[in-house]
Amino acid sequence: MKDRTQELRTAKDSDDDDDVTVTVDRDRFMDEFFEQVEEIRGFIDKIAENVEEVKRKHSAILASPNPDEKTKEELEELMSDIKKTANKVRSKLKSIEQSIEQEEGLNRSSADLRIRKTQHSTLSRKFVEVMSEYNATQSDYRERCKGRIQRQLEITGRTTTSEELEDMLESGNPAIFASGIIMDSSISKQALSEIETRHSEIIKLETSIRELHDMFMDMAMLVESQGEMIDRIEYNVEHAVDYVERAVSDTKKAVKYQSKARRKKIMIIICCVILGIIIASTIGGIFG
């Protein structure tokens, strides 16, 4: 009979090599994944820093009736940078999401997959938080610009309600603000100049908000769905804890009852033994 020991040993060594290769490939994949996570986190931090700088630019522009062009250009550059970086983050998060969905579609489940899902969820939430802050900053700036326009209109003797002013802004026509204003004083001219400046800022702002709206809603819906999933997990965990606690309690009761039953059984055996001794002694006395 042919000795196949060497052949089997070679096959085993080959299998071991395959296992090592798979492990190394998986480790390399996770290393690359964590590098990507750090890159995304860096992008999100950059957006957060830019949002704070945008707030400072807003304050500087509002502090001056006619802000210098340099400040306005710097604000536009910041807004453009936020948009570009946000699109990068969204693209990378989408790529991770698709990779996770593919593995889930193949019914694969591993510690690595759970880690990736957790990291993706954390980054998505952080991204939505910083973009929510940016959106709130833009909305606040719009309201402040709107307030300045309303005050300048009052200076010219024209009173408007908030709804009327909103209609004027939505028209997108700067000339509508000059309607009914008597341009016979430098005060009226200066007021109209600031109105036009603020209106121009609002138009740029609304364009930026529209550009980011779809992306923001897409990510917000993703995070909301993740939140529902996390809530379900927490619910299941809480109920699992309750179940375990009840099981422990029931086990303690069972042990207690079992202990009592065992003691009763021992007492019965002892009584039987004693009774047997008494009967044996009695019979012995009779026949003795």
Swiss-Prot record:
Recorded GO CC terms: acrosomal vesicle; actomyosin; axon; glutamatergic synapse; membrane; neuron projection; nuclear membrane; plasma membrane
List of residues that carry Phosphoserine: 14, 64, 95, 188
Loss of function: phenotype: Mutant mice show impaired glucose tolerance without any marked hyperglycemia.
Location of this chain's protein in the cell: Cytoplasmic vesicle, Secretory vesicle, Synaptic vesicle membrane; Synapse, Synaptosome; Cell membrane
Any Pfam family hit: SNARE
Region feature (Disordered): 1-20
Bilayer topology term: Single-pass type IV membrane protein
Coiled-coil portions: 68-109
Transmembrane segments: 266-286
GO molecular function: ATP-dependent protein binding; calcium channel inhibitor activity; calcium-dependent protein binding; chloride channel inhibitor activity; identical protein binding; kinase binding; myosin head/neck binding; protein-containing complex binding
PTM annotation: Phosphorylated by CK2. Phosphorylation at Ser-188 by DAPK1 significantly decreases its interaction with STXBP1. Sumoylated, sumoylation is required for regulation of synaptic vesicle endocytosis.
Listed name of the protein: Syntaxin-1A
Species annotation: Mus musculus (Mouse)
